[in-house]
């Protein structure tokens, strides 16, 4: 996503003036993220560890956009046994959590969890709900629609997708069965 790339580069550029060590770390994360996107995303399945590292790098880069009003909680567990997953499966949900869940003028939160339960993988994302005006809803739902199609193709009959708009928050959970 060019918009993400340009925003991240601008954020890192500003960070260089304040904290060079952190800026250098974020450049490394951006490099890893781009490398993963270029070289791993064309594989049918990837090791879960690589996907977790990708999500972690992405989330850390998105934190650069957050101010003190935003709380970001991340709990990504590497499974005890080797598991494989479709690459970049959850990125649209993480993007949406930051896009719709973080507001620079209001208290906001994003909670992302990923864990193994036996042979299953469970991804959970919850974020504060800051509704946008109806005029700013172009393209709404395309990422989620594409995610559903990818799930149908890659995990037919082997996934569960739950989403809910709760009081002041949006919640989504995806369970992938038999990911060994």
Task: Please provide the spans of the model-predicted regions.
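C-terminal end segment of the histidine kinase catalytic
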Residues: 179-180
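Two-component histidine phosphotransfer core
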Residues: 3-175
């Amino acid at each position: 996503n060019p918009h993400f790339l340009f925003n991240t580069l601008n954020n890192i550029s500003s960070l260089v003036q304040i904290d060079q060590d952190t800026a250098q770390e974020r450049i490394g994360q951006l490099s890893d993220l781009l490398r993963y996107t270029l070289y791993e995303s064309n594989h049918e399945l990837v090791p879960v560890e690589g996907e977790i590292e990708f999500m972690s790098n992405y989330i850390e880069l998105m934190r650069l956009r957050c101010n003190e009003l935003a709380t970001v909680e991340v709990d990504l567990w590497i499974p005890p046994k080797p598991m494989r997953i479709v690459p970049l499966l959850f990125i649209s949900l993480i993007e949406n959590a930051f896009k719709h869940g973080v507001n620079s003028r209001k208290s906001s939160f994003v909670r992302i969890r990923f864990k193994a339960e036996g042979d299953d993988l469970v991804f959970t994302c919850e974020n504060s709900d800051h509704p946008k005006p109806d005029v700013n809803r172009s393209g709404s739902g395309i990422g989620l629609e594409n995610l559903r199609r990818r799930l149908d193709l890659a995990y037919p009959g082997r996934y569960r997708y739950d989403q809910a708009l709760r009081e002041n928050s949006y919640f989504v959970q995806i369970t992938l069965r038999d990911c060994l």
